[in-house]
């Protein structure tokens, strides 16, 4: 996911300050996720759950989702509307898919990430965390498509 982000950053970087900030927020979210799941350079084994890493990831996650829905998507839809009806229609479809994706992530958050972790639900938590990663990957693909759609036209 970081490679995909790097590619997009190189593609649109510097052309729009809002998009640049958004992509930087995505990078922070990914780093927080990787830290939480134990993906670190030069690390040999997974460690026990780091509560601070969980808190950091959850905060980054909620901030990222909020920024997308309450600031960026609306601006991108407005930008799409200035180009053409077809572009607006495609962007609106992506926006609906992103809303559904947000709902999935928030369900994971409410059911697994926001609750205390103990030995009884550790495996369930790890599975939920993996699902969140997969859902984030889907989200980033949708967002990348929206960015490219709007900024290629």
From Swiss-Prot:
Question: What are the record keywords, sorted?
Answer: Cytoplasm, Transcription, Transcription regulation
A Pfam family that the UniProt record links to this protein: Rsd_AlgQ
Annotated Gene Ontology cellular components are: cytoplasm
From the UniProt record, give one GO term of the biological process aspect.
regulation of DNA-templated transcription
Asked if Zinc-finger is a keyword of the record, the answer is no
What the entry lists under InterPro entries is as follows: Rsd/AlgQ_sf, Sigma70_reg_Rsd, Sigma70_reg_Rsd_AlgQ
Q: Where in the cell is it found?
A: Cytoplasm
Subunit note? Interacts with RpoD.
What role does this protein play?
Binds RpoD and negatively regulates RpoD-mediated transcription activation by preventing the interaction between the primary sigma factor RpoD with the catalytic core of the RNA polymerase and with promoter DNA. May be involved in replacement of the RNA polymerase sigma subunit from RpoD to RpoS during the transition from exponential growth to the stationary phase.
Task: Give the family per the record.
Answer: Belongs to the Rsd/AlgQ family.
Q: What is this protein called?
A: Regulator of sigma D
Organism per entry: Pectobacterium carotovorum subsp. carotovorum (strain PC1)
